[in-house]
Regions:
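Short, basic, alpha-helical segments at the C-terminal edge of helix-turn-helix-like DNA-binding modules
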Residues: 21, 51-61
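Hydrophobic alpha-helical connector segments
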Residues: 62-89
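Amphipathic alpha-helical packing segments from all-alpha helical-bundle domains
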Residues: 78, 82, 86-87, 106-131, ...
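Hydrophobic/aromatic-rich alpha-helical bundle segments in the mid-to-C-terminal region
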Residues: 96, 128-175, 185-195
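Helix-turn-helix
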Residues: 2, 6, 10-44, 48
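Short hydrophobic clusters on alpha-helical segments that form packing/core surfaces
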Residues: 3-11, 53, 57, 84, ...
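Alpha-helical DNA-contacting segments of helix-turn-helix folds
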Residues: 11, 46-53, 98, 114, ...
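Amphipathic alpha-helical segments used for helix-helix packing
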Residues: 87-106, 151-157
Length: 195
């Protein structure tokens, strides 16, 4: 825990590529060998922090949709993307490890894999509210939508250091436009209270 807290503090001041195991050890007042005892390398340490971000993403997805405000399927997309933008802008670990530029390929792979899982969860949320048609397989369109939005967020983070309202809006427009290729403008609402 002390090691993780040290990395969070370092991430507030530096990019991921500028942090070494030595820096982490110095920040938490431990011997470098102690840090290596817990994590074999810096990428492994970052990966463990990213796992915490993924847990947060899962919780966020469960909490961000206000059923009283869901009148059209695009409301779900807006609520999900708005929640993720707020999370990214307040979490340096997520911003720097997911949106930032670094050479840790394993982290990018883990993020893509998690988006595939999230895509299925997002689809279940949509189906909870609307009778949407069968979707193409094997790629989940909601996972693609999440990845597309992340690309815009990444551009914003790299240029401005955070996700600007303007680029958050662009990500929303892009993800919504993509989803409209598969989800009709008018979908029958599902009465899940009586189901």
């Amino acid at each position: 825990l002390k090691i993780n807290e040290a990395v969070v503090r370092l991430m507030e001041r530096r990019e991921a590529t500028d942090i070494s195991m030595y820096d982490v050890a110095k920040e938490c007042g431990m011997a470098t060998s102690t840090v290596y005892h817990h994590y074999p390398n810096i990428e492994n340490l970052f990966h463990s922090l990213l796992e915490n971000v993924f847990v947060d993403f899962d919780l966020l997805l469960k909490q961000c949709v206000d059923e009283e405000q869901v009148l059209h399927w695009t409301d779900i997309n807006r609520m999900i993307e708005t929640a993720y933008v707020n999370y990214y802008n307040n979490n340096p670990i997520a911003k720097k490890l997911i949106l930032g530029r670094h050479t840790f390929a394993e982290l990018g792979h883990a993020d893509t894999e998690h988006d595939l899982e999230l895509g299925h969860q997002v689809e279940m949320i949509y189906r909870q509210f609307f009778d949407i048609p069968q979707l193409p397989q094997p790629i989940n369109i909601f996972a693609i939508s999440l990845q597309v939005a992340d690309k815009i967020y990444s551009l914003s983070y790299r240029k401005y250091g955070y996700i600007t309202p303007e680029l958050a809006k662009e990500a929303l427009r892009l993800s919504e436009s993509y989803l409209q290729l598969y989800i009709p403008p008018i979908c029958q609402k599902v009465d899940f209270h009586s189901a």
